[in-house]
């Protein structure tokens, strides 16, 4: 998430939220596509007895059980790669958090999977915001999240999913949002 420099007299504070268009998703989708294609072609080569790969000689593999197993893993990898490329294309999880003093509305918008709930939008009035809450959990699976506490709705997460953001950025962003909205920060 970006940390724009915003003075409190500006009417709109907006944070873009990075969804599935992260470098790590591009990396894994590419690696899995290449590996899955290789495995699928190796399995197909063992079935057709024609070498379809520039490296190695999968023709020497017996189709049952080696070729069919390699082909199955190739198909599974290609299906996973299609899923990853689709989520990247649809930008699942991407969106923005917008705090608008002019209209008095807080909008949290995220893109979802295609269908009925493709666009996920939560709107609330600024007076309904009770606090900005920070949750920090260190360890093997660290969690650093900023939540917006709303009356009657509970806590709504504002930060992206995936790599935890640095503590200084987390604290600065929470302080900026709390200052902009005129509410307290909880959890520090």
Swiss-Prot record:
The chain crosses the membrane at residues 28-48, 68-88. GO terms for biological process: photosynthesis. It is a multi-pass membrane protein. It is found in: Cellular thylakoid membrane. GO terms for cellular component: photosystem I; plasma membrane-derived thylakoid membrane. It holds the Pfam family Ycf4. InterPro entries: PSI_Ycf4_assembly (IPR003359). Keywords: Membrane, Photosynthesis, Thylakoid, Transmembrane, Transmembrane helix. Belongs to the Ycf4 family. Seems to be required for the assembly of the photosystem I complex. PANTHER family: PHOTOSYSTEM I ASSEMBLY PROTEIN YCF4 (PTHR33288:SF4), PTHR33288. This is Photosystem I assembly protein Ycf4.
């Amino acid at each position: 998430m970006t940390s724009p420099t915003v003075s409190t007299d500006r009417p709109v504070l907006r944070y873009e939220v990075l969804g599935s268009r992260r470098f790590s998703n591009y990396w894994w989708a590419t690696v899995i596509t290449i590996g899955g294609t290789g495995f699928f072609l190796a399995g197909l080569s063992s079935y057709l007895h024609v070498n379809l790969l520039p490296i190695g000689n999968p023709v020497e593999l017996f189709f049952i059980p080696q070729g069919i197993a390699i082909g199955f893993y190739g198909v599974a990898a290609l299906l996973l790669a299609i899923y990853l490329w689709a989520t990247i294309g649809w930008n699942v999880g991407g969106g923005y958090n917008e705090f608008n003093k002019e209209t008095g509305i807080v909008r949290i918008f995220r893109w979802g999977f295609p269908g009925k709930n493709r666009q996920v939008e939560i709107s609330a009035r600024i007076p309904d915001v009770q606090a900005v809450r920070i949750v920090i959990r260190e360890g093997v699976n660290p969690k650093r999240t900023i939540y917006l506490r709303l009356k009657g709705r509970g806590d709504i997460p504002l930060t992206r999913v995936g790599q935890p953001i640095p503590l200084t950025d987390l604290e600065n962003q929470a302080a900026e949002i709390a200052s902009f909205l005129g509410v307290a920060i909880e959890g520090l």
